[in-house]
Amino acid sequence: MAMGEALRAAAADAVVTFLWVLCVSTLGASTTAVTSYLRLQGVHFALLVTVSLLSVLLFVFNILCDALGGASFNPTGVAAFYAAGVTSPSLFSIALRLPAQAAGAVGGALAISELMPAQYRHMLGGPSLKVDPHTGAGAELVLTFVITLAVLLIIVKGPRNPIIKTWMISICTLCLVLSGAAYTGPSMNPANAFGWAYVNNRHNTWEQFYVYWICPFIGAILAAWIFRAMFLTPPPKPKAKKA
Protein backbone atom coordinates (compact mmCIF):
# COMPACT_ATOMS: atom_id res chain seq x y z
CA MET A 1 0.00 0.00 0.00
CA ALA A 2 1.38 3.39 -0.99
CA MET A 3 2.00 6.14 1.52
CA GLY A 4 -0.97 8.16 0.27
CA GLU A 5 -3.38 5.23 0.61
CA ALA A 6 -2.11 4.46 4.11
CA LEU A 7 -2.61 8.08 5.18
CA ARG A 8 -6.11 8.14 3.70
CA ALA A 9 -6.98 4.91 5.54
CA ALA A 10 -5.69 6.37 8.81
CA ALA A 11 -7.64 9.59 8.29
CA ALA A 12 -10.81 7.63 7.51
CA ASP A 13 -10.36 5.56 10.67
CA ALA A 14 -9.86 8.70 12.76
CA VAL A 15 -13.08 10.25 11.42
CA VAL A 16 -15.13 7.07 11.81
CA THR A 17 -13.84 6.42 15.34
CA PHE A 18 -14.57 10.02 16.32
CA LEU A 19 -18.15 9.64 15.11
CA TRP A 20 -18.55 6.17 16.63
CA VAL A 21 -17.50 7.23 20.14
CA LEU A 22 -19.60 10.37 19.81
CA CYS A 23 -22.70 8.35 18.85
CA VAL A 24 -22.35 5.12 20.82
CA SER A 25 -21.82 7.05 24.05
CA THR A 26 -25.40 8.32 23.74
CA LEU A 27 -26.98 4.84 23.79
CA GLY A 28 -27.73 4.93 27.51
CA ALA A 29 -29.27 8.39 27.35
CA SER A 30 -31.15 7.55 24.14
CA THR A 31 -32.59 4.38 25.66
CA THR A 32 -33.76 6.33 28.70
CA ALA A 33 -35.30 9.04 26.54
CA VAL A 34 -37.13 6.57 24.27
CA THR A 35 -38.49 4.40 27.09
CA SER A 36 -39.63 7.49 28.99
CA TYR A 37 -41.33 9.00 25.94
CA LEU A 38 -43.10 5.73 25.08
CA ARG A 39 -43.79 5.03 28.78
CA LEU A 40 -42.16 1.63 28.58
CA GLN A 41 -41.26 0.05 31.90
CA GLY A 42 -39.16 -3.00 32.59
CA VAL A 43 -35.65 -4.15 31.81
CA HIS A 44 -36.78 -6.19 28.81
CA PHE A 45 -38.14 -3.10 27.07
CA ALA A 46 -34.94 -1.18 27.79
CA LEU A 47 -32.84 -4.00 26.34
CA LEU A 48 -35.05 -4.17 23.24
CA VAL A 49 -34.69 -0.43 22.69
CA THR A 50 -30.92 -0.60 23.20
CA VAL A 51 -30.52 -3.48 20.73
CA SER A 52 -32.67 -1.64 18.19
CA LEU A 53 -30.71 1.60 18.53
CA LEU A 54 -27.38 -0.24 18.38
CA SER A 55 -28.51 -2.13 15.27
CA VAL A 56 -29.41 1.11 13.51
CA LEU A 57 -26.09 2.62 14.55
CA LEU A 58 -24.09 -0.38 13.32
CA PHE A 59 -26.02 -0.48 10.04
CA VAL A 60 -25.30 3.21 9.37
CA PHE A 61 -21.65 2.84 10.32
CA ASN A 62 -21.23 -0.22 8.12
CA ILE A 63 -22.39 1.88 5.17
CA LEU A 64 -20.11 4.74 6.21
CA CYS A 65 -17.09 2.46 6.65
CA ASP A 66 -17.66 0.88 3.24
CA ALA A 67 -18.01 4.31 1.65
CA LEU A 68 -14.66 5.29 3.15
CA GLY A 69 -12.90 2.27 1.69
CA GLY A 70 -13.12 -0.15 4.60
CA ALA A 71 -12.58 2.19 7.54
CA SER A 72 -12.77 0.79 11.07
CA PHE A 73 -13.41 2.16 14.56
CA ASN A 74 -11.93 -0.77 16.52
CA PRO A 75 -8.18 -1.54 16.58
CA THR A 76 -8.79 -5.19 17.51
CA GLY A 77 -11.05 -5.54 14.48
CA VAL A 78 -8.27 -4.37 12.17
CA ALA A 79 -5.82 -6.81 13.77
CA ALA A 80 -8.28 -9.71 13.78
CA PHE A 81 -9.36 -9.41 10.15
CA TYR A 82 -5.69 -9.19 9.16
CA ALA A 83 -4.73 -12.21 11.29
CA ALA A 84 -7.66 -14.21 9.90
CA GLY A 85 -6.60 -13.44 6.34
CA VAL A 86 -9.91 -11.72 5.54
CA THR A 87 -8.19 -8.41 4.74
CA SER A 88 -4.60 -7.71 3.76
CA PRO A 89 -3.54 -4.16 4.66
CA SER A 90 0.17 -3.44 4.96
CA LEU A 91 1.74 -3.43 8.41
CA PHE A 92 2.68 0.21 7.79
CA SER A 93 -0.96 1.04 7.21
CA ILE A 94 -1.96 -0.75 10.43
CA ALA A 95 0.74 1.14 12.33
CA LEU A 96 -0.83 4.41 11.17
CA ARG A 97 -4.44 3.38 11.65
CA LEU A 98 -4.26 2.29 15.29
CA PRO A 99 -3.04 5.63 16.72
CA ALA A 100 -5.42 7.44 14.36
CA GLN A 101 -8.30 5.48 15.88
CA ALA A 102 -7.11 6.33 19.39
CA ALA A 103 -6.92 10.03 18.48
CA GLY A 104 -10.39 9.89 16.94
CA ALA A 105 -11.77 8.28 20.09
CA VAL A 106 -10.28 11.02 22.25
CA GLY A 107 -11.94 13.63 20.05
CA GLY A 108 -15.28 11.81 20.20
CA ALA A 109 -15.18 11.44 23.99
CA LEU A 110 -14.27 15.11 24.46
CA ALA A 111 -17.00 16.21 22.05
CA ILE A 112 -19.82 14.20 23.62
CA SER A 113 -18.71 15.33 27.08
CA GLU A 114 -19.43 18.89 25.97
CA LEU A 115 -22.53 18.20 23.87
CA MET A 116 -24.44 15.83 26.15
CA PRO A 117 -27.38 17.54 27.92
CA ALA A 118 -26.77 18.07 31.62
CA GLN A 119 -29.50 15.65 32.77
CA TYR A 120 -27.81 12.77 30.93
CA ARG A 121 -24.17 13.66 31.55
CA HIS A 122 -23.92 11.28 34.50
CA MET A 123 -24.38 8.40 32.05
CA LEU A 124 -21.07 9.17 30.35
CA GLY A 125 -17.68 7.97 31.49
CA GLY A 126 -16.74 4.97 29.39
CA PRO A 127 -15.41 1.63 30.63
CA SER A 128 -13.67 1.49 34.00
CA LEU A 129 -11.95 -1.27 35.96
CA LYS A 130 -14.13 -2.61 38.79
CA VAL A 131 -11.94 -5.55 39.84
CA ASP A 132 -8.21 -6.18 40.25
CA PRO A 133 -6.10 -5.66 37.09
CA HIS A 134 -5.44 -9.35 36.42
CA THR A 135 -9.12 -10.29 36.68
CA GLY A 136 -10.05 -7.33 34.51
CA ALA A 137 -7.40 -8.23 31.94
CA GLY A 138 -8.69 -11.79 31.80
CA ALA A 139 -12.25 -10.55 31.37
CA GLU A 140 -11.30 -8.25 28.48
CA LEU A 141 -9.34 -11.05 26.82
CA VAL A 142 -12.26 -13.48 27.00
CA LEU A 143 -14.90 -10.91 26.02
CA THR A 144 -12.87 -9.66 23.06
CA PHE A 145 -12.14 -13.23 21.99
CA VAL A 146 -15.85 -14.07 21.99
CA ILE A 147 -17.03 -10.91 20.20
CA THR A 148 -14.26 -11.19 17.59
CA LEU A 149 -15.04 -14.82 16.83
CA ALA A 150 -18.76 -14.01 16.67
CA VAL A 151 -18.23 -11.06 14.33
CA LEU A 152 -15.97 -13.07 12.02
CA LEU A 153 -18.49 -15.91 11.87
CA ILE A 154 -21.42 -13.57 11.26
CA ILE A 155 -19.70 -11.42 8.64
CA VAL A 156 -17.78 -14.09 6.74
CA LYS A 157 -19.91 -17.21 7.25
CA GLY A 158 -23.24 -15.79 8.41
CA PRO A 159 -26.42 -14.81 6.58
CA ARG A 160 -26.17 -12.65 3.48
CA ASN A 161 -28.85 -10.22 4.61
CA PRO A 162 -27.02 -7.19 6.08
CA ILE A 163 -29.93 -6.33 8.40
CA ILE A 164 -29.90 -9.80 9.97
CA LYS A 165 -26.11 -9.65 10.28
CA THR A 166 -26.30 -6.30 12.04
CA TRP A 167 -29.03 -7.52 14.38
CA MET A 168 -26.99 -10.61 15.32
CA ILE A 169 -23.88 -8.54 16.03
CA SER A 170 -25.94 -6.12 18.14
CA ILE A 171 -27.38 -8.92 20.28
CA CYS A 172 -23.93 -10.49 20.77
CA THR A 173 -22.44 -7.13 21.70
CA LEU A 174 -25.15 -6.30 24.22
CA CYS A 175 -24.94 -9.75 25.84
CA LEU A 176 -21.19 -9.37 26.29
CA VAL A 177 -21.51 -5.80 27.58
CA LEU A 178 -23.94 -7.02 30.23
CA SER A 179 -21.67 -9.98 31.05
CA GLY A 180 -18.62 -7.77 31.51
CA ALA A 181 -20.28 -4.83 33.22
CA ALA A 182 -19.15 -5.92 36.68
CA TYR A 183 -15.53 -6.37 35.57
CA THR A 184 -14.26 -3.74 33.13
CA GLY A 185 -17.22 -1.79 31.85
CA PRO A 186 -16.54 -3.53 29.40
CA SER A 187 -14.75 -2.10 26.36
CA MET A 188 -13.74 -4.72 23.77
CA ASN A 189 -12.46 -1.70 21.87
CA PRO A 190 -9.07 -0.28 22.93
CA ALA A 191 -9.65 3.02 21.13
CA ASN A 192 -12.95 3.67 22.91
CA ALA A 193 -11.37 2.79 26.26
CA PHE A 194 -8.43 5.09 25.55
CA GLY A 195 -10.69 7.99 24.60
CA TRP A 196 -12.54 7.89 27.89
CA ALA A 197 -9.37 7.18 29.86
CA TYR A 198 -7.89 10.35 28.36
CA VAL A 199 -10.94 12.37 29.39
CA ASN A 200 -10.67 10.96 32.92
CA ASN A 201 -6.86 11.33 33.00
CA ARG A 202 -6.22 7.58 33.26
CA HIS A 203 -4.74 7.08 29.79
CA ASN A 204 -1.06 7.01 30.76
CA THR A 205 -1.16 4.13 33.27
CA TRP A 206 0.14 0.59 32.95
CA GLU A 207 -3.28 -0.67 34.07
CA GLN A 208 -4.97 1.01 31.09
CA PHE A 209 -2.45 -0.46 28.64
CA TYR A 210 -2.54 -3.93 30.20
CA VAL A 211 -6.30 -4.33 30.63
CA TYR A 212 -7.66 -2.42 27.64
CA TRP A 213 -4.95 -2.85 25.00
CA ILE A 214 -2.70 -5.89 25.48
CA CYS A 215 -5.32 -8.45 26.52
CA PRO A 216 -8.02 -7.42 24.01
CA PHE A 217 -5.46 -7.73 21.20
CA ILE A 218 -4.44 -11.18 22.45
CA GLY A 219 -8.08 -12.27 22.57
CA ALA A 220 -8.86 -10.88 19.13
CA ILE A 221 -5.84 -12.45 17.44
CA LEU A 222 -6.46 -15.83 19.10
CA ALA A 223 -10.04 -15.72 17.84
CA ALA A 224 -8.83 -14.82 14.35
CA TRP A 225 -6.35 -17.71 14.27
CA ILE A 226 -8.98 -20.19 15.45
CA PHE A 227 -11.47 -18.88 12.89
CA ARG A 228 -8.88 -19.13 10.14
CA ALA A 229 -7.92 -22.69 11.11
CA MET A 230 -11.47 -23.98 11.53
CA PHE A 231 -13.63 -22.08 9.06
CA LEU A 232 -11.50 -20.82 6.19
CA THR A 233 -10.65 -23.45 3.62
CA PRO A 234 -7.02 -23.17 2.51
CA PRO A 235 -6.51 -22.74 -1.23
CA PRO A 236 -5.90 -26.04 -3.04
CA LYS A 237 -2.29 -26.89 -3.67
CA PRO A 238 -1.33 -26.92 -7.34
CA LYS A 239 -0.82 -30.40 -8.68
CA ALA A 240 2.72 -31.29 -9.54
CA LYS A 241 3.27 -31.68 -13.24
CA LYS A 242 4.31 -35.09 -14.39
CA ALA A 243 7.67 -35.27 -16.05
Curated annotation (Swiss-Prot):
It is a multi-pass membrane protein. Belongs to the MIP/aquaporin (TC 1.A.8) family. SIP (TC 1.A.8.10) subfamily. It comes from Zea mays. Keywords: Membrane, Repeat, Transmembrane, Transmembrane helix, Transport. Its main location: membrane. It comes from the Eukaryota. Aquaporins contain two tandem repeats each containing three membrane-spanning domains and a pore-forming loop with the signature motif Asn-Pro-Ala (NPA). GO terms for cellular component: membrane. The chain crosses the membrane at residues 9-29, 45-65, 98-118, 136-156, 163-183, 211-231. SUPFAM superfamilies: Aquaporin-like. A motif (NPA 2) lies at residues 189-191. It is found in: Membrane. This is Aquaporin SIP1-2. A motif (NPA 1) lies at residues 74-76. Aquaporins facilitate the transport of water and small neutral solutes across cell membranes. One of its GO terms (molecular function) is water channel activity. The gene is SIP1-2.
